[in-house]
Amino acid sequence: VADICAAPGGKTAQLANAGADVIAVDRSPSRTKRLEQNLNRLDLKADIVIADATEWEPNKKFDAVLIDSPCSATGTIRRHPDILYSKTTNDLAKLLKLQWKLLLTGAQLLKPGGKLIFCTCSMQTEEGEQQIEKFLKLNRSFERQPISKEEVGGYSCFINEKGDLRILPFFLKELGGIDGFFASRLICK
């Protein structure tokens, strides 16, 4: 598995803990150091590469690629209410371009039959659903592999009409809420 926006390593650790061989790629040396510290603390292993994922050229293709993309982070609003005031329209435009480049990069890294997971902690459909719809429209060799409620603890409210994971901050309000999140699983035909 290639995790191409890996730092600080939470999802890398989950993949490694599940038994996956993970190559964790991130462009930030300081954040990559934190990723390494987190893996060491958890006694988990992953190959760590410091590189801009959009320019990284590994010598192999992968069964799966995870893109936990940089985003506006609007899904964290319940913990960071100032998030709505700290991002501009220009910031969003730059993030959308980067997300698109990461999607195209991730697609190129996959073996046939491989899975591409794209996720953000944004509530903005431009950074989630719209990116995936645009990608599928322009990349006919991919199709959505719907996420089932059984894969997310039986919470059918977490799954949108297309089969993507779409969590909103008011979900699980009896437990204090949850961060907003989007994830889509695509398969390379």
Protein language model annotation of sequence segments:
Residues 1-189:
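S-adenosylmethionine
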